[in-house]
Design a protein with these regions (language model features):
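Positively charged, solvent-exposed patches that mediate nucleic-acid binding
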Residues: 1-110
């Protein structure tokens, strides 16, 4: 779904994007967008806490978000995007999650 170069994997990268990035909120997601200025592919990170649901629900939400982000590519280089799922994302249809991700990426990455 989302290739390795497009994933945030280090905790320090997550922290930097959340603390220094622009934040966009909605009823199902909070999205932090940071333009690092580096020449590398756009990277996505996901935070899905236990408040969202049990492990099955959290993994389903994470897979849906990864698919929604993969559909946004290609994006400008050097952008880190961290998506925090809120409890309402557990019951939201994929189309609503996709629309939320599109809206946040459009506002932050363009």
């Amino acid at each position: 779904m989302l290739a390795r170069p497009h994933r945030l994997v280090r905790g320090s990268d997550y922290r930097t994007a959340v603390r220094r990035g622009r934040r966009y909120g909605g009823p199902r997601l909070i999205v932090s967008v940071l333009d690092t200025g580096e020449t590398r592919p756009t990277r996505f990170g996901f935070i899905v806490s236990k408040q969202v649901g049990n492990a099955v629900v959290r993994n389903t939400v994470r897979r849906r978000l990864k698919d929604a982000c993969a559909r946004q590519l290609p994006l400008p280089e050097g952008i880190d995007i961290v998506i925090r799922a809120l409890p309402a994302s557990a019951t939201a249809p994929f189309a609503e999650l996709l629309a939320d991700v599109e809206r946040a990426v459009e506002r932050g990455a363009v």
